[in-house]
């Protein structure tokens, strides 16, 4: 047979031998073919020519297939790294869950005066500064336009009052779930307004005028070796009703402080290196039995003071307010 002939039956037999003896040289395959099929293959060189034809055909097919998939690449990842915001100041007052217009003014005044007397140089507004219940799924009567304006005006009035009490302090506002309800409502019900920055809290409340920085809910505060956030992304499900601080520990395995739960709690454990890990939840500064949760008896008024040392170590004063007194 000439090297240019292409008998199908011979090609089929050669392909079977290639699959059966992978890695063998063409000469070895030719000898196996002659030994196995002496009536079909009788010459080493002619058999090698058939093998070259078959392997070139297979190779071309593989090359075409590989070239096709060479055009594919991994899609660009949109994954984001966890974001932190470091507070460099060392004497911090934590106020959270004020829920304007349902705030407790007496408790707010006590907490802020406590900070003023101790020369705090930073205030963390730990989320849910506004209530925004009409913008969520809770059963609530729809607000009038005047009510909505009042929500913003009252919140701005509070921010102005707070700045007047501590004019040189850094103020950082962490977005809470109630703060975010307005944006979620706009996104679903009024997307045109959602796309207008004027209706976002930082602009609508003139935060720049009061030198207040607003952090979105996914950003984590870092105060020395202590971390913090509003808490609604931390204590979900079964943890909140039992011991919020323990739920924070189970979730974060870090020194961590939250608001959100409207109750003061603490939990500490040590790791295998005997490093102490502490977690806290801070009480609220608003009504204790809101209309959407009228039977709750676990809420308490409270705030916290955090003192950070130069090496990052810290102390947390997790204060309660009971019958007009700080305890």
Regions found by a protein language model. Give the residues of each.
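Short, amphipathic alpha-helical "recognition" segments used to contact nucleic acids or chromatin
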Residues: 6-24
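DNA-recognition alpha helix
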Residues: 28-40
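Mobile, glycine- and charge-enriched loop segments
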Residues: 71-105, 223-224
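Structural motif
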Residues: 90-92, 121-124, 226, 255-257
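Active-site-proximal loop/helix segment associated with metal-binding centers of metalloenzymes
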Residues: 189-227, 231, 235-242, 252, ...
């Amino acid at each position: 047979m000439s090297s240019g002939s292409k008998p199908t039956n011979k090609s089929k037999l050669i392909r079977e031998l290639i699959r059966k003896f992978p890695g063998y040289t063409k000469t070895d395959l030719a000898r196996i073919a002659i030994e196995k099929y002496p009536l079909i293959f009788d010459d080493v060189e002619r058999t090698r020519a058939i093998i070259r034809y078959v392997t070139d055909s297979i190779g071309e097919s593989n090359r075409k297939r590989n070239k096709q998939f060479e055009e594919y690449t991994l899609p660009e990842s949109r994954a984001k790294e966890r974001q932190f915001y470091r507070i460099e100041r060392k004497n911090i007052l934590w106020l959270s869950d004020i829920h304007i217009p349902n705030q407790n003014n007496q408790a707010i005044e006590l907490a802020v005066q406590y900070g003023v007397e101790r020369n705090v140089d930073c205030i963390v507004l730990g989320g849910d500064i506004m209530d925004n219940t009409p913008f969520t799924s809770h059963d609530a009567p729809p607000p009038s336009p005047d009510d909505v304006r009042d929500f913003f005006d009252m919140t701005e009035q509070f921010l102005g009052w707070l700045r007047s009490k501590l004019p040189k302090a850094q103020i950082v506002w962490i977005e809470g779930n109630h703060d975010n309800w307005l944006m979620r409502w706009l996104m679903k019900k009024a997307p045109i307004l959602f796309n207008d920055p004027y209706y976002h809290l930082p602009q609508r409340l003139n935060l720049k005028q009061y030198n207040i920085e607003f952090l979105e809910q996914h950003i984590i505060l870092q105060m020395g070796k202590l971390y913090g956030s509003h808490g609604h992304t931390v204590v979900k499900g079964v943890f909140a009703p039992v011991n919020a601080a323990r739920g924070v520990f189970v979730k974060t395995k870090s020194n961590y402080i939250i608001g959100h739960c409207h109750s003061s709690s603490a939990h500490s454990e040590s790791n295998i290196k005997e490093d102490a890990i502490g977690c806290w939840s801070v009480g609220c500064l608003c009504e204790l039995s809101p209309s959407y949760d009228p039977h709750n008896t676990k809420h308490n008024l409270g705030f916290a003071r955090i003192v950070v040392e130069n090496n990052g170590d810290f102390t947390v004063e997790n204060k309660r307010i009971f019958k007009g007194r700080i305890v």
